[in-house]
Each structure stands twice: as C-alpha cells, then as structure tokens.
Amino acid sequence: MSLTVVPAYEHPQEIGALFSEYTQALIAGEPSFSGYLSLQNYDEEVQHLEEKYGMPWGRLYLARWNGAPAGCVGLRRMDEWNCEMKRLYVRPQYRDKRIGGKLVQQVIDDAKTIGYSHMLLDTFSFLDSAVRMYRALGFYEIERYNNNPIDGCIYMKLDL
C-alpha cells in the first residue's frame, strides 16, 4: 500500500473528476454552494488549472493510492504574503489513510518555500473531520476574507 503525491498539471482528466466529486459532495452538504461556484468562475477554473494554481506562485497536486487517483489539493496566490488552500478532497474509500493530512502538509511546505507568510482557507462546519485536522495543524478561525455568501462557512488562517 503506497501513497504518492505528484504535480497534477499533466493529469487534467483525473483532477477534473476529483474536482467534480468534491463539488457534488459540497453541494450535497450545503445546497447553496452551487451559487458560490459561479462567483468563483469554477467552470473556467477547471478548464485552465494553471492560471489559478500554476507555478511559481501556486501548486496543484494529485494523490495516488497504489496508483489510483485518491485526492487532490490546490494552492493559489492571493497577494505577496498570503496564499489560499483550495479544493482539498479525498475520495471516501481512501479517507482512513491520512491522505488529506499529507496533501495539506505538502502545500504548507510549498507555501513556506515560496515565501508566503499566511495560508487561508474557507470550509464548512459540516466537514468536521477537516476542521479538526486544520486546527491540529495550527489553523485558527478568522473573520470572512472573501466573497463567500454562504452561512455556516468557517474561515481559517495559518501563520507560516
């Protein structure tokens, strides 16, 4: 049983499938999330991954478990000092393997190497295991930092 984490730019179909599963899971938990996707230009994001997550300021990773696509995470630049973790998702059948934590640690390490001072994220309160993981990694709650209109959203920050 092995985990590999690789840059995802050469795997658009696998990332597209993971992003689709991710958004469907969020819409199932919070139906109003579908409206927020349009504010984020989500369809365009999926078609042009490198524009949002490309190097040198961003990252996009694909996690594989025994070669099968298991999860993903993105990192995007907000400004010179701040970045945002996006689209962390692990398929349900792989959630007991600590893949999410490895993906998050990968983008934290990258953010430090790039030179960011802070990493931000938004998540939903119903994603309780993710919120617990973020807190365990040092993230803390902050005020809203983006245009997310959804009630029940949690905004978090990590000092790098």
Question: How would you name each of these model-derived features?
Answer:
Residues A111-D122:
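Conserved GNAT acetyl-CoA-binding A-motif
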Residues L120-V131, R135-Y155:
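Conserved catalytic-core motifs of GNAT/GCN5-like acyltransferases
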Residues L3-K86, R91-P92, V104-Q106, D110, ...:
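Acetyl-CoA-dependent GNAT
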Residues C72, G101, M133, I154-L158:
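Accessory recognition modules or surfaces
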Residues E80-N82, H118, C153:
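A generic structural signal for beta-strand entry/edge sites
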Residues R98, K102, Q106, D128-S129:
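Alpha-helical macromolecular-interaction surfaces
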Residues R95:
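Glycine-rich ATP-binding loop(s) of histidine-kinase-like ATPases
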Residues G67, R98, G115:
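Conserved G/P- and acidic residue-centered "switch" motifs that form tight phosphate/ATP-binding loops
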